[in-house]
């Protein structure tokens, strides 16, 4: 016969004001640890966009039109290393640089290029472990086509001439110089430690 006597059930810890205060402090500490990360991502995207817009303005004569050797696009080489902040920074930078008030001669029609810029920057980031150069090349071709259509709409320029010329300019800045920037910064390793992805 089992003579063991079961004791009373364990009493849960008392919900004292001191205990609640301690739990609130722990929650605040967790939030404080997370929030700097978010602020770093937001500030990185903002700095990237500002740099893009500044470079587009500085090299305005060659950043638009048929030449379209937009030096600002060199920054896209940082997208595979930084990730989402750079994708958003690239998109916001294009949005700012393509404003008519900012000096874009094409007018509002050039704002359509914000969408492919976002999509192909995101694709570049997704391809970071497969082929960065392929991602940069796809970005160049896609933007070469959409910018050429914008030029055709604004100035009635022939697409057969525009697409190769515009794509070549974007390719040089993006796939060639952007890839060189990617290789150089990757070799340093600093961004990989700041933005592990």
Q: What are these regions, as identified by a protein language model?
A:
Residues 4, 12-51, 157, 182, ...:
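Membrane topogenic helices and adjacent juxtamembrane segments
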Residues 16, 30-32, 44, 91, ...:
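Residue-identity detector for threonine
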Residues 17-24, 55, 68, 105:
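A subset of signal/propeptide-processing and intrinsically disordered low-complexity segments
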Residues 27-92:
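Hydrophobic transmembrane alpha-helices
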């Amino acid at each position: 016969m089992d003579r063991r006597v079961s004791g009373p059930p364990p009493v849960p810890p008392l919900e004292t004001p001191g205990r609640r205060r301690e739990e609130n402090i722990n929650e605040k500490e967790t939030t404080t640890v997370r929030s700097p990360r978010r602020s770093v991502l937001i500030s990185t995207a903002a700095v990237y966009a500002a740099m893009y817009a500044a470079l587009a303005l500085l090299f305005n004569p060659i950043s638009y039109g048929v030449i379209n050797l937009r030096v600002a696009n060199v920054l896209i080489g940082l997208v595979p290393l930084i990730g989402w902040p750079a994708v958003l920074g690239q998109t916001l930078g294009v949005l700012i640089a393509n404003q008519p008030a900012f000096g874009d001669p094409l007018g509002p029609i050039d704002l359509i290029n914000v969408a492919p810029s976002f999509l192909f920057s995101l694709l570049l980031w997704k391809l970071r472990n497969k082929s960065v150069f392929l991602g940069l090349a796809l970005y160049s071709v896609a933007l070469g086509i959409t910018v050429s259509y914008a030029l055709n709409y604004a100035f009635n320029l022939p697409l057969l001439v525009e697409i190769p010329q515009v794509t070549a300019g974007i390719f040089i800045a993006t796939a060639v110089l952007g890839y060189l920037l990617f290789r150089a910064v990757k070799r340093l390793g600093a961004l990989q430690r700041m933005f592990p992805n």
